[in-house]
Amino acid sequence: MTEQPLKVLFVSAEVVPFAKAGGLADVAGSLPRALASSGVDVRVAMPRHGQIPRGAYVTDYMVEVDARKETAVIREGRIEALPGGKSVPVYFIDNYQYFGRENIYGYSDDGERWGFFSRALLEMLEPIDFIPDILHFNDWQCGPAIALLKEEYRHHPAYRRIASVLTVHNLEYQGHFGRDILQFIGLRQDLFRPDALEFYGQVNFMKAGLVFADLINTVSRTYAEEIQTSEYGWGLDGLLRLRHSDLFGIVNGIDVEVYDPATDPHIPHHYSADNIEGKKRNKAELQRQFGLPVSEAPLLGLVHRLVDQKGIDLFEGIEEALFREDLQLVVVGQGDPRYEGLFRRLKQHFPEKVGLFIGFDTPLAQRVYGGSDFFLMPSRFEPCGLGQLIAFRYGAIPIVRSTGGLADTVTDVRFPNGNGVVFEAYQPDRFLEAIRRGLHLYRQKDRWQQLIAKVMRLDHSWRRSADEYMQLYGRARRKVNPEL
């Protein structure tokens, strides 16, 4: 008898290529493809946001929220297959009132929107004839669904054997709403207590997921440890310590087809680990594009949201010392006006050393990776970080603070397996010292060339991460179904 493939429904608020607000969408578009290429029967569920085409009609049904009936229409799309793999079906949960909008997040009725999505998701499984072994949820928007699965739907025979996994991509974002959201969703009022969903007088959707998920993971091993501390736990560290035996860390991968300097359509000159001449030409093109002198001065790239989390304040107070060095800095990003203003001032004071683009532009970001010698990630905290993994792929050496996924993926060049420059203390002078160590390394040309070739050959594909997720799924299934 042929063994049935593992069935996984991957649930996310955003998924590339359909809708994206942040890195979650990249994960949700890439990990299912890698799972499918490993033989998993994986499907994706998400809302049909306003910018998403209608897709093929599958079915519709009524969903009860707030003691009234709302219609959910299911439409289907697909994520293209990896080479040698299978394409991934995507189920769009369509309700114009809640999701026919321009943005994914940031509305006053977000509690109702994600509450409706949660119940509509669980009601969808039988109409589409797909009862998964694993419901893989992502971030706070899925919290109500996890609670509903455990508190209500577990009594339904078809749902009894489903195991739930919650991936926390960034614990800072939790989803806080008034107590009345429980009635809207249809969750019991007695769950409004400190050991369940109550959090400082509000309902916390992330906490709902952390309390009721069978297993939890974050997007790096170090971040899984960090969120159990008061410094990084955002008020949920006590709960996470209680659940430490159910908490795991799996580092994200990157889409090595998209991020490939040998084929990337956004960079002017292609190159590889075997021949990096194209990278030198890309650097000159980048310098010209940003109005910088074309020179061999080391070029530092920074492509981030300009917010506290990314460590941008570490530039404050080291500007004069930094730009006395023989270097150039190219910045692409937007965010806090304080940090946008900081880089505008630096551009004004050091016009031959600083290139700046306020905003986000994917082709331009790719050119920064393709032309930079170093890539800066001095993050205050970083659950995983994709920037350093992309930088490796393009031969830009990361200069990072040792936190979260940066600690898991970047090892200082002082060690035999080193692949970047790492500093520990969150202090401007430590950041400056790390940059200076990088500049010293850059001047050792033979060692520098060897390091570039080495980091470009590192394997940070999703296939490796997918193998770890399959092990996690097995553990979750055995927890719910001990007979397996």
Swiss-Prot record:
Keywords tagged on the record: Glycogen biosynthesis, Glycosyltransferase, Transferase
SUPFAM superfamilies: UDP-Glycosyltransferase/glycogen phosphorylase
Gene Ontology molecular function, alphabetical: alpha-1,4-glucan glucosyltransferase (ADP-glucose donor) activity; alpha-1,4-glucan glucosyltransferase (UDP-glucose donor) activity
Pathway stated in the Swiss-Prot or TrEMBL entry: Glycan biosynthesis; glycogen biosynthesis
Keyword RNA-binding attached: no
Catalysis: reaction(s): [(1->4)-alpha-D-glucosyl](n) + ADP-alpha-D-glucose = [(1->4)-alpha-D-glucosyl](n+1) + ADP + H(+)
Entry keyword Transferase: yes
Domain of life per record: Bacteria
EC number: 2.4.1.21
GO BP: glycogen biosynthetic process
InterPro entries, sorted: Glyco_trans_1, GS/SS, Starch_synth_cat_dom
Residues bound to ADP-alpha-D-glucose: 20
Residue ranges the record marks as coiled coil: none
Function: Synthesizes alpha-1,4-glucan chains using ADP-glucose.
Similarity comment text for this entry: Belongs to the glycosyltransferase 1 family. Bacterial/plant glycogen synthase subfamily.
Protein name, UniProt field: Glycogen synthase
Species this protein is from: Heliobacterium modesticaldum (strain ATCC 51547 / Ice1)
